Amino acid sequence: AIGHLENFSSDDAILGALAKGGLGDAFMQLNQPGDALGFYESAIAHNNNEYTTPKFLYKAGVTAIELGQSEKALQYFERIKNDFSDSDEASTIDAFIGMAKSGN
């Protein structure tokens, strides 16, 4: 899957972000959260939209917590709360903000 996604190219902003995020998911499955976080960050930067951005901000935040990067996680979670308050991810984001603030 990684080889196919790395070679994927699309002019569509959402598909491009989904491909980068898919690479992040693949690296999480391989227990390589550092690599996964890089791809989630790439997916976030690829295109700012209401569909993929909060999804990958959430995944990046959870991954950052796993890596012990609570401050980074807090930034991702607060961006969801502030910029994507209508997203599905925002419905439970306060709990994740609390987790990041507590350093867990």
Show where each model-derived region lies.
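Short solvent-exposed coil/turn linkers within tandem alpha-helical repeat scaffolds
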Residues: N7-A17, I44-T53, I80-I93
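Extracytoplasmic/luminal low-complexity segments enriched in Pro/Gly and acidic/polar residues
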Residues: E89-N104
